[in-house]
Amino acid sequence: MKRLWDISPPVSADSPVFPGDTPYRQQWKWSLTPDCPVNVSEITLSPHIGAHADAPLHYENGAAAIGAVALEPFLGPCRVIHAIGCGPLILPEHLAHAQAGLPPRVLVRTARHAALQWWVDDFSAYAPQTIEWLAGRGVTLIGIDTPSIDPASSKTLDSHHAIRRHDMRVLENLRLDDVDEGDYELIALPLALVQADASPVRAVLRELA
């Protein structure tokens, strides 16, 4: 059996969220008793918690919700590239060493250990010119091990609008701590949420050989 790497952080009430966004909450609506045959919970959360896929609706009014987005970009050959210690922005030169034969999906690891217990503002993000550089090499999906492809302080979301122009897809909040640089199969399908601006994903990598 081919090896799997789970690259989705655990989701719980302790999961960090963007300041002001909705945290994970869970309460039990039904409990297993002699009069009730099941446990059933109610969950409230932002669709941007944990590993998730943004929809075009997230950064453009009237654009496609996540349930209308094609699934093909979220499944297939993928390259993990290490840019550990790259600083606030991932630049093309941080990825150039791994550009030969680039597959359509690229995930970038920026940290030795993803921040899973608390929110941090100074995470690494993609420079817009890096989106252009990747799009020019046929990349259709990008991912990152931080909460956003844009800096936390950004009000213009330049990298999000760069992927909009190129009709690219994005995965954020991945956990790549245990993943070596190299090629894998990505499986990270979003839910068919017909009105949502994003969806949680259970993202995994599978070895190719």
From Swiss-Prot:
Cofactor: Zn(2+)
Disulfide bonds: none
Gene: kynB
Enzyme Commission (EC) number: 3.5.1.9
Organism annotation: Bordetella pertussis (strain Tohama I / ATCC BAA-589 / NCTC 13251)
Domain of life: Bacteria
Function: Catalyzes the hydrolysis of N-formyl-L-kynurenine to L-kynurenine, the second step in the kynurenine pathway of tryptophan degradation.
Protein name: Kynurenine formamidase
UniProt keyword annotations, A-Z: Hydrolase, Metal-binding, Tryptophan catabolism, Zinc
Assembly and interaction partners: Homodimer.
Example GO biological process: anthranilate metabolic process
Gene3D superfamilies, alphabetized: Putative cyclase
Keyword Hydrolase found: yes
